[in-house]
Design a protein with these regions (language model features):
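C-terminal regulatory/interaction regions
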Residues: 1-3, 266-330
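Short aromatic-enriched loop/helix-cap "lid" or pocket-rim segments at secondary-structure transitions
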Residues: 32-34, 111-114, 209-210, 252-253
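Metallo-beta-lactamase
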Residues: 44-53, 142-158, 165, 172-265
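Short, contiguous alpha-helical
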Residues: 93, 178, 311
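Histidine-centered divalent metal-coordination motifs
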Residues: 78-84, 102, 181, 185, ...
């Protein structure tokens, strides 16, 4: 038990007064997700909760005990991807913590994690019409079933719109709606101390996946870029992301992310040239061959989001038939 205590101390760190970052493992990936614990006497509030794996749930419970919290009072989820929402049903609902989620995330939960068959078929059709070979489309559409195994759902107590104030521990945080990575993605902003809890919206090293797919909004890239500019305009003193370490300079990071996506738009326009292409062709040309099918799916989603942004800007045209979607220079 002493060794377990040492391990939790290594994974748990106070990143601001009364704010503790807990780094949790992500099953299936060689990575970590940061969740944030806000202790308040014998209770605590949580921002995100990791996947519903034994290792993650045990780590959260040990962190709560280490901080003297006997129960979770509020669980706020930045978005319903499994590494952020997975353990929601373990810590919230049915007399446990109150669960807060943006209202645009709520209708995505049931088809993604509970009754999967319709979404699996919808994703398969989406992959096929965008040029994915049938064998790959079958594998990729069925991969959703594996993710559902690390998610325990819960009904929200509060559906958020943005601009609400939520007390987390001793802090009062404002909800910032930042769609793009997910339709109802939110950040939490501590106006008093200039702390931005950024979820997956602004990461210090990685560019979050901005994808066009059956559960996305119609134009996720433009929404994402607008949200980046809004968060930079808040001028936070410290950004606390869901992946990677806290960092102080949001302005230069946002500039880098915006420039990255603008370069990618130009690259895709060059790839299309004068030849009509599928989203799958564009993704393979842009990112090259990859053995990992899941990475290929993310590449397709990201490529399609950029193609859609180019279409909105009037720089490409989109041709849709019952069996295919093709893109060409406008």
């Amino acid at each position: 038990m002493e060794n377990a205590g040492v391990a939790i101390e290594l994974a748990l760190s106070e990143v601001a007064a009364g704010v503790f970052e807990l780094r949790l493992p992500i099953p299936f990936e060689d990575g970590l997700v940061n969740v944030f614990v806000f202790p308040d006497r014998h209770e605590a509030d949580l921002l995100d909760c990791g996947m519903n794996s034994d290792e993650s749930v045990e780590a959260i419970n040990r962190a709560l005990a280490h901080l003297g919290a006997k129960r979770v009072r509020r669980l706020v989820v930045t978005h319903i991807h499994p590494d952020h929402y997975g353990a929601a049903g373990t810590f919230a609902g049915e007399g446990r913590a109150d669960l807060y989620i943006h209202r645009l995330e709520v209708p995505l939960v049931h088809p993604r994690y509970v009754e999967l068959e319709h979404l699996v078929e919808e994703v398969r059709h989406y992959l096929l019409v965008n040029g994915v070979p049938a064998e790959d489309a079958d594998v990729l559409s069925n991969s959703q079933r594996a993710l559902s195994q690390v998610v325990k759902t819960a009904d929200p107590s509060v559906q958020l719109d943005g601009a609400e104030l939520i007390d987390m521990g001793a802090r009062r945080l404002r909800v910032e709606w930042t769609p793009g990575h997910s339709p109802g993605h939110i950040c939490l902003y501590d106006v008093a101390d200039g702390l931005l809890f950024a979820g997956d919206h602004v990461l210090p090293e990685l560019s979050p996946n901005i994808g066009l797919h059956p559960q996305s909004t119609p134009d996720p890239l433009h929404e994402y870029l607008e949200g980046l500019r809004r968060m930079a305009g808040r001028r936070p003193k410290l950004v606390l992301p869901a992946h990677g370490r806290p960092f102080p300079d949001i302005a230069s990071r946002v500039d880098a992310l915006v420039s990255h996506h603008r370069r990618r738009l130009d690259q895709i326009l060059e790839i299309i040239g004068r030849e009509e292409k599928s989203g799958w062709q564009v993704a393979l040309d842009l990112w090259g061959p990859r053995d990992n099918l899941y990475e290929k799916r993310l590449a397709l989603q990201e490529g399609l989001a950029h193609l859609q942004a180019l279409a909105v800007e009037g720089r490409v045209s989109k041709s849709v038939t019952p069996g295919s979607v093709r893109w060409a220079s406008a």
